[in-house]
Amino acid sequence: QNRHPPIPPAP
């Protein structure tokens, strides 16, 4: 279970 906000995809 991830307890961190989703990381946006890099451009």
Curated annotation (Swiss-Prot):
Keywords: Hypotensive agent, Metalloenzyme inhibitor, Metalloprotease inhibitor, Protease inhibitor, Pyrrolidone carboxylic acid, Secreted, Toxin. One of its GO terms (molecular function) is toxin activity. It is found in: Secreted. The modification Pyrrolidone carboxylic acid is found at Q1. Disulfide bonds: none annotated. Expressed by the venom gland. GO terms for biological process: regulation of blood pressure. This peptide both inhibits the activity of the angiotensin-converting enzyme (ACE) and enhances the action of bradykinin by inhibiting the peptidases that inactivate it. It acts as an indirect hypotensive agent. Belongs to the bradykinin-potentiating peptide family. This is Bradykinin-potentiating peptide 11j.
